[in-house]
C-alpha cells in the first residue's frame, strides 16, 4: 500500500517527469485484462496477477475501449487545474463524472477516479478497477 501511495504521489506532483514516463512505459509490458478478469479483481478473487508495482494502476484502466489515449492524456494533464474545474462542475450540479461520460474527456474521468480512490477507499486499486469497469461498460 505504501508503494501505491508513493506512486500516486509521484504522479500528482511530477506529471510529465521521468517518473510519469516510467509508469507509462511499465504499462506497455502488462497485458490487457478482460471484462471477466476485471469482475474477478473487483470481487477480490484474484490478486496475484498484480504484483507489478508501477504498472498496476495503469492496467486496471487500460482495458478494451479504455485505450492508451486515456492514459496518455492523464499523464499529460495539469492535475490540479482539472480537479478544480471538475469539482466546480460537480458542486454546481452541472456534472456527474461517471454519468456524463459521453460529454467528459477521459482525462477528467481519470482525475475523478484517482481522487475518489485516494479519498474514499481503503483499497484504492479496487476502487479504480470498479470505476474503470463502469467506464468500459458505458462506452
Name these PLM-found stretches.
Residues 2-10, 14:
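Sec-dependent signal peptide recognition
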Amino acid at each position: 500500500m505504501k508503494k501505491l501511495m508513493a506512486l500516486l504521489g509521484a504522479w500528482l506532483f511530477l506529471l510529465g517527469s521521468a517518473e510519469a514516463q516510467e509508469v507509462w512505459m511499465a504499462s506497455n509490458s502488462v497485458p490487457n485484462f478482460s471484462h471477466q478478469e476485471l469482475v474477478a479483481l473487483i470481487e477480490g478473487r484474484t490478486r496475484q496477477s498484480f504484483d507489478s508495482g508501477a504498472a498496476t494502476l495503469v492496467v486496471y484502466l487500460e482495458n478494451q475501449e479504455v485505450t492508451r489515449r486515456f492514459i496518455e492524456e492523464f499523464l499529460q494533464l495539469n492535475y490540479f487545474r482539472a480537479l478544480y474545474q471538475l469539482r466546480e462542475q460537480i458542486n454546481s450540479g452541472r456534472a456527474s463524472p461517471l454519468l456524463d461520460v459521453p460529454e467528459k474527456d477521459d482525462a477528467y474521468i481519470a482525475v475523478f477516479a484517482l481522487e475518489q480512490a485516494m479519498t474514499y477507499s481503503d483499497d484504492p486499486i479496487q476502487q479504480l478497477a470498479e470505476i474503470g469497469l463502469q467506464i468500459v461498460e458505458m462506452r
